[in-house]
Amino acid sequence: MATTTTTQGQQTAIDSAVLDDIIRRLTEVRLARPGKQVQLSEAEIKQLCTTARDIFLQQPNLLELEAPIKICGDIHGQYSDLLRLFEYGGFPPSANYLFLGDYVDRGKQSLETICLLLAYKIKYPGNFFLLRGNHECASINRIYGFYDECKRRFNVRVWKVFTDCFNCLPVAALIDDKILCMHGGLSPDLDHLDEIRNLPRPTMIPDTGLLCDLLWSDPGKDVKGWGMNDRGVSYTFGPDKVSEFLTKHDLDLVCRAHQVVEDGYEFFADRQLVTVFSAPNYCGEFDNAGAMMSVDENLMCSFQILKPAEKKTKFMMSTKI
């Protein structure tokens, strides 16, 4: 049984049988039509959030993980694609997972997506890891869909409980001291990895500074040093900054998400950085594939690809025969 103390001080326990039932209900819809909703109770969601929040705070802000592990990028509420990722990679605990953030917003099923991820975090705290993305932030997900989904299916209270949980998510992970993972990218304020370890939690995401950059910055092919970012937040950084950073910290690779890429993954700076994006047909507007990066015991990286659904298939699925 996992026990958590809420901010009010009363004990809330999530019984392991309750947790298993939540996971069962959330995963059995993979056998149904894509898009079928799973409506948990408000009490169950609160238990997931408060229990996961405690685990996040017990674990470091810079996670230190070991391979083998599978790394996934943005999901953005595309729940049926999240279930496809687990079908490809193996449902926990058959594989270790690290997700790089942006679980909510834009897609139709942010609630199912984040609830399953939190449930797996609670069930397998030493094998399943979640980082914070720039959308795990009240000021962003208030606008891009998650708030509206919470309000439509529950109430604003539920959204606030998620906000408290998101404010405690770790922001980076180091795999075998060689692969540094975060949602966005590098920062001009990052001189030592201890600066990540020492970032405060719980916290909102500030408009500038190290935490902001880790979740918002982007690589820029034509940039030397640090450049302006078209997002209006943080910076872009050139291949020179990636090389400099890896050399200084004796690292092999930076792994990040945050940008849709056509093949689901894309290398940068002579394979010193990789972008992984795991939401195929992003928003129904892009023809991109989704990818998951598998890191084996020897730190060899390979990619499993979720192809974008063909338009024809989508049409046939929605047609009664």
Curated annotation (Swiss-Prot):
Q: Which CDD domains match?
A: MPP_PP1_PPKL
Q: Which reaction does it catalyse?
A: O-phospho-L-seryl-[protein] + H2O = L-seryl-[protein] + phosphate; O-phospho-L-threonyl-[protein] + H2O = L-threonyl-[protein] + phosphate
Q: What happens when the gene is disrupted?
A: Dwarf phenotype and decreased fertility.
Give the enzyme class.
Answer: hydrolase
Cofactor(s) listed: Mn(2+)
Which of this chain's residues are annotated to bind Mn(2+) 2? D102, N134, H183, H258
Magnesium listed as a keyword: no
Family per UniProt? Belongs to the PPP phosphatase family. PP-1 subfamily.
What is this protein's function per UniProt?
A: Serine/threonine-protein phosphatase that possesses phosphatase activity toward para-nitrophenyl phosphate (pNPP) in vitro. Acts as a positive regulator in the gibberellin (GA) signaling pathway to regulate plant growth and development. Promotes the GA-induced and proteasomal-dependent degradation of the DELLA proteins RGA and GAI by directly binding and dephosphorylating these proteins. Involved in the regulation of phytochrome B (phyB) signaling pathway that controls photomorphogenesis.
Instruction: Output this protein's name.
Output: Serine/threonine-protein phosphatase PP1 isozyme 4
Q: Which organism is it from?
A: Arabidopsis thaliana (Mouse-ear cress)
Q: Which gene encodes it?
A: TOPP4
